[in-house]
C-alpha cells in the first residue's frame, strides 16, 4: 500500500498543473487562432492584488490603440486636473448699464465644455435680463482663444466622421451666438444692431454668469459611449493646465508624456497625437495601457472616478452587447477601441480567485473587427474563470481521487 501511495504521489507531482498554470495554458491556446497568421496582438495582464505581471504577449510592441487612447487621456486628466475639475463657459460684458441699456459689448468666452446646451444659453440670457438689461447697444464677441485655431486633430482621416474642435459649441454645432441672440430676444432684450465678431475678452470685463459641468459628467459619455468630441475637449483641458494660451495639442502631449515618465516608461518611443484615438499617428503598447491602469488603481482619486465611467460587459456602453454571459458578464469594465484594422480593449476584471486584474489587448491588422472582439471576449472569459478542461488537468483530478480513495481504504483497515 505504501508503494502504491508513493507511486500515486509521484505521478501527481509529475503532472500537477496549478490553477494559474492551467489558466496560462488556456490563454496561450487562444493565441493559436488562425487569425494571427495575418494579424498581430499585443497584450498584458497585471495582477493588482499580487502586484506582478500575470501574463503578457508582445506587450511592448508599438501599436495603434484606437479609442483605448481615451484611457490615457482620462487617467492623465484626473491626475493633472483633479477629480473636482469643472469645464466652464462664461459670459462677460464691458461698458455700463444705464436705464436698461447696455452700452458695451457682450463676450462669450468658450472653455471647450462639450456639454454646453440650450439650458446654459437660456441661463446666460436670463442673467442679462436679471441685471436690468433690456437693450444691447454693442457687439456680441466670441472668445475662442483658450485653444489653438485648429478644427481637427493631427493624423485624422479626411473622410472620417470627425468632430470639429471648437471651444464654443452647442451639441457639436457652431450655433452658440445664434442661440444666444434668440434667447435674448425671448427675454425681451432688444439688440439695436446684431454685430458678431471674434476677439479676446478684456481683463477688466464684468462677469455676467458662469455655466459649468464636472469632469465626472464628461467622463461618463466619453468612456461609455466612446465620444471623441468629449475626449478632445478633455485633452485640451489638459493642455490648458500648462498655462499656455492658446493651449496647443502639443501642450497636452507634453503632460501625457510626463505621466508616462513618472510611471517608469518614459524611455519607450511612444507617439501621442490626440486625446480620442482617432489619429493614425498614435502608437502605444499594451504594457503602457496596463501600467497606467495600475497607476489609476493605486491612486483612489483617479480610480474612484475612472472605474464607474468604464463600460460594463453585458450591461452598458460599448460593451452592452458583448460578454453577455459567462463569468465576464458584469465583471469586466473596460474601454473599447475600433478603427479600420484595429480592435482594442483595456480595463479591469476580477479573477476567479478574487484577485483584481487590469489588462490591455490591442489587435492590429484585423480586417474584420468582429474577429478582434471575439478574441478579446474569449480572453476575458478565460481570465475571469470560465471552466474548460486543459490537457493534464483531468489526469490530475483522477490522481487526486485515487489518492483520496487509497487513504480511505487505508483508514478502514486500521
Q: Model segments located where?
A:
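Bacterial Sec-dependent N-terminal signal peptides
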Residues: 1-22, 414
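Beta-lactamase-like hydrolase cores
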Residues: 19-49, 53-62, 126-132
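Extracytoplasmic
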Residues: 38-40, 58-60, 66-69, 84-86, ...
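Soluble periplasmic/extracytoplasmic beta-strand elements of cell-envelope proteins
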Residues: 42-46, 54-56, 105-109, 139-143, ...
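Active-site SXXK
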Residues: 51, 65-83, 140, 179-183, ...
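Active-site-adjacent helix/loop patches that line small-molecule binding or acyl-intermediate pockets
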Residues: 89-95, 101-184, 213-255, 284
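A small/polar active-site loop signature that marks catalytic segments
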Residues: 174-307
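C-terminal soluble interaction/assembly domains
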Residues: 271-274, 278-414
Amino acid at each position: 500500500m505504501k508503494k502504491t501511495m508513493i507511486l500515486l504521489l509521484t505521478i501527481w507531482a509529475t503532472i500537477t498543473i496549478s490553477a494559474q498554470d492551467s489558466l496560462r495554458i488556456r490563454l496561450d491556446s487562444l493565441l493559436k487562432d488562425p487569425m494571427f497568421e495575418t494579424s498581430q496582438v499585443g497584450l498584458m495582464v497585471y495582477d493588482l492584488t499580487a502586484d506582478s505581471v500575470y501574463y503578457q504577449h508582445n506587450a511592448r510592441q508599438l501599436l495603434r490603440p484606437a479609442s483605448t487612447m481615451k484611457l490615457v487621456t482620462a487617467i492623465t486628466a484626473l491626475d493633472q486636473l483633479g477629480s473636482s475639475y469643472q469645464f466652464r463657459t462664461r459670459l462677460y460684458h464691458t461698458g455700463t448699464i444705464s436705464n436698461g441699456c447696455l452700452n458695451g459689448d457682450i463676450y462669450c468666452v468658450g472653455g471647450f465644455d462639450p456639454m454646453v446646451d440650450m439650458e446654459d444659453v437660456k441661463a446666460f440670457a436670463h442673467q442679462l435680463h436679471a441685471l436690468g438689461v433690456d437693450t444691447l447697444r454693442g457687439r456680441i464677441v466670441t472668445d475662442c482663444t483658450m485653444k489653438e485655431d485648429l478644427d481637427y486633430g493631427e493624423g485624422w482621416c479626411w473622410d472620417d466622421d470627425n468632430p470639429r474642435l471648437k471651444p464654443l459649441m452647442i451639441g457639436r454645432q457652431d450655433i452658440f451666438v445664434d442661440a444666444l441672440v434668440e434667447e435674448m430676444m425671448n427675454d425681451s432684450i432688444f439688440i439695436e444692431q446684431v454685430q458678431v465678431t471674434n476677439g479676446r475678452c478684456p481683463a477688466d470685463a464684468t462677469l455676467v454668469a458662469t455655466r459649468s459641468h464636472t469632469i465626472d459628467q464628461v467622463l461618463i459619455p466619453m468612456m461609455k459611449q466612446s465620444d471623441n468630441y468629449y475626449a478632445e475637449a478633455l485633452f485640451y483641458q489638459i493642455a490648458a493646465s500648462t498655462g499656455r494660451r492658446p493651449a496647443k495639442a502639443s501642450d497636452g502631449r507634453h503632460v501625457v508624456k510626463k505621466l508616462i515618465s513618472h510611471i517608469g516608461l518614459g524611455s519607450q518611443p511612444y507617439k501621442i497625437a490626440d486625446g480620442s484615438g482617432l489619429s493614425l499617428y498614435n502608437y502605444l503598447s499594451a504594457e503602457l495601457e496596463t501600467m497606467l491602469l495600475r497607476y489609476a488603481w493605486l491612486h483612489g482619486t483617479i480610480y474612484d472616478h475612472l472605474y464607474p465611467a468604464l463600460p460594463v460587459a453585458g450591461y452598458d456602453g460599448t460593451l452592452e452587447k458583448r460578454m453577455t454571459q459567462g463569468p465576464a458578464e458584469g465583471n469586466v469594465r473596460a474601454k473599447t477601441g475600433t478603427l479600420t484594422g484595429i480592435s482594442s480593449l483595456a480595463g479591469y476584471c476580477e479573477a476567479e480567485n478574487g484577485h483584481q486584474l487590469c489588462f490591455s489587448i490591442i489587435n492590429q491588422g484585423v480586417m474584420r473587427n468582429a474577429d478582434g472582439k471575439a478574441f478579446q471576449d474569449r480572453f476575458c472569459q478565460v481570465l475571469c474563470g470560465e471552466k474548460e478542461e486543459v490537457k493534464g488537468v483531468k489526469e490530475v483530478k483522477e490522481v487526486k481521487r485515487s489518492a483520496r480513495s487509497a487513504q480511505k481504504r487505508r483508514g478502514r483497515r486500521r
